[in-house]
């Protein structure tokens, strides 16, 4: 396996990684249409076909008793760590809460903006090659902080029952109901509603390509957070960085799935060589070795560039989900970062700290979309409404201007709405 690449070789890998087969979208459209028209009947058939679900509609929803049982199966260490993570995520997202505001003009007009939470939020939690309690936390906690009263979680059941760690995380994070269903059919159920699963106002959370395309297609029927793709990290490092750290950080992303990306960019050829050696060494120790190998082959590597400016330019071009600056005085480079979902500064801020415990959200824009998308936040679960109050004095001061503008646009009923109020005063 070739690990040390030039810039062109890496960009070629990235371009091939972004290619999406058109027939997948057609399959997803069919699933969405059938769930929209047939509801639970189509949903349960797809759950059996794609999720391996063996039950019926009566046990599609996870019971409180099953969650109680899950608590007895998880260890105290996990529960303590989970609660610490939830508190840190809660504290961070609470700082994001915007305030409604009003301003009063001299003539008595009152203008303002108010924020209200959506009524029902749907969160998608993957259940593929691994279980992700952390994804539950990162999706549910911002919704709870925003004030959402009903948080509906969907996640495919693998095996005879739901993962107990995921169930415990859901209750601890404030999820109000859980359904054992995944894939595009779960997104369809959340978007259109069925007799069993309620229609939601917003859908958040990452998934596979089918989930991502489904979210793209239902956008407009409901709101979504973003179109999340495979996980990725780019690490910029100089000779002060430890090869052990760089190799481990590459591998931590590559183990997600075969399309995940772990990239190191450096202008130190010797550091690149030593990092490649450490990657080979660590690979022998990891249980998800085959997944990692495919990921590195598909979209990973160590790129040697001329200098730090070229490294930053390449990183901004890639616009990664996670960017690590493993450099002396990393804060000095922060202003040069234009595109990244999250930025990790220094030797002791590896990406997994953000995945689990730091506090900022780990649901981040991928596949170059950090050029225009932002991390999941309380904003995804809030709506803004403008508030307008005119006093009589304020109305009369502005009325003739409104009439002129409305008539210029040919909207004479708009002008009439103002004129009748003038004539009655």
UniProtKB/Swiss-Prot annotation:
Gene3D superfamilies: 1.20.5.1300, Nitrogenase molybdenum iron protein domain (3.40.50.1980). It holds the Pfam family Histidinol_dh. Zn(2+) binds at residues 253, 256, 355, 414. GO terms for molecular function: histidinol dehydrogenase activity; NAD binding; zinc ion binding. It comes from the Bacteria. Substrate binds at residues 231, 253, 256, 322, 355, 409, 414. InterPro entries: Ald_DH/histidinol_DH, Histidinol_DH_CS, Histidinol_DH_monofunct, Hstdl_DH. It is an enzyme of class 1 (oxidoreductase). It catalyses: L-histidinol + 2 NAD(+) + H2O = L-histidine + 2 NADH + 3 H(+). PROSITE patterns: HISOL_DEHYDROGENASE (PS00611). Its EC number is 1.1.1.23. Its cofactor is Zn(2+). One of its GO terms (biological process) is L-histidine biosynthetic process. Binds 1 zinc ion per subunit. Keywords: Amino-acid biosynthesis, Histidine biosynthesis, Metal-binding, NAD, Oxidoreductase, Zinc. The keyword Ligase does not apply. Belongs to the histidinol dehydrogenase family. Catalyzes the sequential NAD-dependent oxidations of L-histidinol to L-histidinaldehyde and then to L-histidine. This is Histidinol dehydrogenase.
């Amino acid at each position: 396996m070739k690990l040390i690449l030039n810039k062109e070789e890496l960009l070629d890998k990235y371009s091939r990684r972004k290619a999406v087969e058109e027939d997948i979208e057609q399959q997803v459209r069919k699933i969405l249409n059938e769930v929209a028209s047939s509801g639970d009947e189509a949903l349960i058939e797809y759950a059996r076909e794609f999720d391996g679900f063996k039950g019926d509609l009566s046990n599609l929803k996870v019971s409180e008793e099953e969650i109680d049982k899950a608590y007895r199966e998880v260890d105290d260490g996990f529960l303590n760590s989970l609660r610490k993570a939830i508190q840190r995520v809660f504290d961070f997202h609470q700082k994001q809460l915007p305030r409604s505001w009003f301003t009063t003009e001299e003539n008595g007009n009152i203008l303002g903006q108010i924020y209200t939470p959506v009524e029902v939020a749907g969160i998608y939690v993957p259940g593929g090659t691994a279980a992700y309690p952390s994804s539950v936390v990162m999706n549910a906690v911002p919704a709870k902080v925003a004030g959402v009263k009903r948080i509906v979680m969907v996640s495919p059941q693998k095996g005879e029952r739901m993962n107990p760690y995921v169930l415990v995380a859901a209750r601890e994070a404030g999820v109000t109901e859980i359904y054992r269903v995944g894939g595009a059919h779960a997104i369809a159920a959340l978007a259109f509603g069925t007799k069993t699963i309620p229609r939601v106002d917003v859908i958040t959370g990452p998934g596979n390509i089918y989930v991502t395309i489904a979210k793209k297609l239902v956008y407009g029927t409901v709101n979504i957070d973003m179109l999340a793709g495979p996980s990725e990290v780019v690490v910029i490092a100089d000779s002060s960085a430890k090869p052990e750290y760089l190799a481990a950080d590459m591998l931590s992303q590559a183990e997600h799935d075969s399309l995940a990306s772990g990239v190191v960019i450096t202008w130190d050829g010797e550091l690149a060589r030593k990092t490649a050696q450490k990657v080979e060494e660590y690979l022998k120790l990891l249980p998800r070795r085959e997944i990692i190998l495919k990921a590195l082959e598909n979209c990973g590597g160590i790129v040697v560039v001329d200098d730090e400016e070229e490294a930053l330019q390449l990183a901004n071009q890639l616009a990664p989900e996670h960017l690590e600056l493993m450099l002396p005085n990393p804060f000095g480079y922060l202003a040069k970062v234009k595109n990244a979902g999250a930025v990790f500064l220094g030797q002791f801020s590896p990406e997994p700290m953000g995945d689990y415990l730091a506090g900022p959200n780990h649901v981040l824009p991928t596949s170059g979309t950090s050029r225009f998308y932002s991390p999941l936040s309380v904003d995804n679960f809030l709506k803004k409404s403008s508030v307008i109050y005119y006093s009589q004095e304020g109305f009369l001061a502005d009325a003739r201007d409104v009439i002129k503008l409305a008539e210029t646009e040919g909207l004479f009923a708009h002008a009439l709405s103002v004129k009748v109020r003038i004539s009655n005063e």
